[in-house]
Regions:
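Short, Lys/Arg-rich amphipathic alpha-helical interaction segments
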Residues: 83-85, 90-124
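Short S/T/G/P-rich N-terminal loop/turn motif that feeds into the first structured element of a domain
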Residues: 1-79, 87-91, 121-124
Length: 124
């Protein structure tokens, strides 16, 4: 899982006049290199990341377990879905660029088999 630099650049250049909701689709590793479950490691990451999210005005607005796939391919099997709202794109980018947050991100990477992070804004 790597950051798509072209998408991130495009994201940063969009109008920044409304909140942005980051849709997180997560598939956990069964077992991480440390021997813990991916879900346990991700839970620790989420606890450690929460202060960074709050610091820029972000908030978790919904989370849930992905339990039925009415329309999806085999590769689209996620374990968890999170919606995190930020007051602006700039706020999200500020958090992303924090060296301390980048350190915390290592747990996220250790926990996940794969993930998707989709930026979304409200239709006006």
């Amino acid at each position: 899982m790597t950051l798509n630099e072209d998408e991130l650049k495009s994201f940063s250049q969009c109008a920044d006049d409304q909140p942005v909701v980051m849709i997180n689709l997560l598939k956990f590793k069964t077992t991480t290199e440390s021997g813990e479950s991916g879900e346990a490691v991700y839970t620790r990451y989420a606890q450690n990341a929460a202060p960074f999210v709050a610091e820029v005005g972000g908030k978790l607005i919904w989370q849930g377990k992905a339990d039925h796939y009415i329309v999806a391919g085999e590769e689209d099997r996620w374990d968890k879905v999170l919606l995190v709202e930020y007051p602006s794109r700039a706020a999200f980018l500020q958090m992303l660029q924090s060296p301390k947050f980048q350190e915390v991100q290592k747990e996220r990477l250790a926990a996940l088999e794969c993930a998707a992070l989709i930026a979304s804004t409200s239709l006006k």
